[in-house]
Every structure is written in structure tokens, then in C-alpha cells.
């Protein structure tokens, strides 16, 4: 749901998921729009890429507003949140592109409220992408977490998946 830089959405779309990317920052939204437009043009010569891009839609706006207006009949199966990672406690700086992204986007002080709303609006799962060293978002312990080297995915299981 929250677009970030679009990479996770692209991966999910490449796995066959329909993905709605929401981005509230107009600069980041424009960058994502440009990237999707370029991918669509490249997809004219690459049917696999065209299929992936066709499963992605980009919406400019607040995720909270979008979820708040979503009718119950159109509930999202899974809501994926990618709020800005909190400040690092280590002295090592983040990569330059992420430093620039932090400057453009700023922090996500409303991420906890978005999580609460997502828990009400998702059908099966809410997934929150976090730094492995970060506290749980809004202090809410997930059903389980999947942890990598630097990133953790906190999964809130709301009900059994079909099938």
C-alpha cells in the first residue's frame, strides 16, 4: 500500500499479485510515475515486463484516506506498509540515495495510525517492513516476523488464508 521506492511492489507484481501503490509525497510520486511509464514503454518489447507493470497501479495520496474510503466489499486481501525506517542508532550512515530519500520524504509520524487502520481494513494480512533493529511499529507485536540481514517483515495474521 505505501509505495516506498516501488521495489517491493514490483517484486509482488512479478509474483502475480495485483498491487496498488500509494504515495503521498508529490516528488516521489512523480519519480514512481516516470519509472512505471518507462517500464510500460520497455514492456512493448518485453511481454513479461508488460504483464508485471499491468498489475501495478500508482495512486497519489494519503494511504489513510484511501483505506478510510475503501468500501468493505473492496477490502484488500493484504496490506503492505513500508514506512520510513526510524533513525539509525549506529554511527554508519545509510546509502546516499536513501539519505536523499529521507530528506525528501521526512519521517512517518502517522505510521502507527496507518497500521491501526490497515488492521481494520485488510482481509487476511497486514505486513510491515521494518529495519531489523527497529521496535515494533506502534508497539504492536505481530503474529510472526520474517527477518533478513537488515530488514524485518512483521506479519499480522487477521484470518486464515483461503485454500
Q: Which residue stretches match the model-derived regions?
A:
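Conserved beta-strand/loop positions that form the S-adenosyl-L-methionine
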Residues: 1-3
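Glycine-rich, phosphate-binding/catalytic loops in enzymes
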Residues: 15-17, 95-99, 144
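Residues at the starts of beta-strands that form the adenosine-phosphate
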Residues: 17-18, 125
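Mobile active-site "lid"/loop adjacent to the S-adenosyl-L-methionine
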Residues: 83-114
Amino acid at each position: 500500500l505505501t509505495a516506498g521506492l516501488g521495489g517491493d511492489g514490483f517484486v509482488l507484481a512479478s509474483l502475480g499479485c495485483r498491487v496498488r501503490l500509494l504515495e503521498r509525497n508529490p516528488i516521489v510520486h512523480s519519480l514512481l510515475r516516470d519509472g512505471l511509464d518507462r517500464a510500460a514503454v520497455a514492456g512493448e518489447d518485453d511481454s513479461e515486463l508488460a504483464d508485471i507493470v499491468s498489475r501495478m497501479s500508482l495512486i497519489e495520496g494519503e494511504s489513510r484516506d484511501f483505506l478510510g474510503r475503501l468500501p468493505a466489499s473492496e477490502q484488500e486481501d493484504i496490506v503492505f506498509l513500508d514506512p520510513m525506517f526510524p533513525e539509525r542508532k549506529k554511527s554508519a550512515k545509510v546509502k546516499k540515495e536513501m539519505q536523499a530519500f529521507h530528506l525528501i520524504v521526512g519521517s512517518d509520524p502517522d505510521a502507527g495510525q496507518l497500521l491501526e487502520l490497515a488492521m481494520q481494513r485488510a482481509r487476511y494480512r497486514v505486513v510491515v517492513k521494518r529495519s531489523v533493529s527497529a521496535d515494533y511499529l506502534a508497539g504492536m507485536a505481530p503474529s510472526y516476523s520474517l527477518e533478513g540481514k537488515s530488514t524485518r517483515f512483521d506479519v499480522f495474521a487477521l484470518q486464515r488464508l483461503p485454500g
